[in-house]
Amino acid sequence: MTQTRATQRGGNDSVSAVVVDDSQFMRTVIVDMLEDAGIDVLGTASNGADGVETVLESDPDVVTMDLKMPGVDGIEAVDRIMAERPTPVLVLSAHAADGAELTFEAMEKGAVDFFEKPSGEVSVGLKQQRESLVSTVRSVANADVSATEAAAERTRGDAAGGVSAGATPASTEYPDRPTLLVGASTGGPTVVEGILEALPVEADFRVLVVQHMPDGFTGRFAKRLDDASEYSVREAEDGDRIGGGEAIVARGGSHLEVSGYGGGRLRVSLTDDEPVNNVR
């Protein structure tokens, strides 16, 4: 029976962390925020190599990982951690375009989720997001890394072999243009990518993807899904219409609603209504 870290802690809500960031100022801010919330910070590191060593020595429940660091960067550090001692990793990502690309590379290596660093005055921005950061750290700490990675590898392997996970032969009869809804939060991007890779083309799905992710990242996420899948994938726009063989990704910071149907195509709307369960 696979155990999450919460189960391994005997149901104890206490969480331990290691903070890796090349900025001493950022390390101090993050450590203070986590410790103020009752999270036990076992150690810090200013580069990827020291970060890996600290994780191996202290065996934390979660690691917060900067990406751009001298020497061993965050992507290589995530790769080493997952190879030597699989541990849930939360990437702290910059909003810039290259930051988004690096973030997805880190998630390919096994990072569970990411948290967007605020732009502008870093200390002010982070403190305003204290509650969200702490909540994300706790959620990532409880992720079952082995199960998530195994599922992603299975779907990738099946797709590469031409048979999707749980797929039926090509001769199977599907409903006319069925609609598939995919919703995900912590740890979702890698799994969602595996699902899109494995979807049978002959099913001609209309796919709606809602992945909790900041605006500015969902467009690049859609591009990655488009590259990985035989379906045509794009970021949703207000009033978009979607037919069979197409997939859309809800824009970060917006709700995605199905507002109409005609000629085999769905019409969707984007709204900025109040968050539901603290997300939008």
Spans of features found by a protein language model:
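Conserved acid/base catalytic micro-environments in cytosolic active-site loops
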Residues: 2-6, 11, 16, 24-32, ...
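Hydrophobic "anchor" residues on beta-strands that sit immediately upstream
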Residues: 17-18, 62
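Conserved acidic carboxylate
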Residues: 21
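Short hydrophobic/Thr-rich beta-strand motif most characteristic of the beta2 strand and flanking loop
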Residues: 38-46, 54
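Active-site beta3 strand of CheY-like receiver
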Residues: 58-64
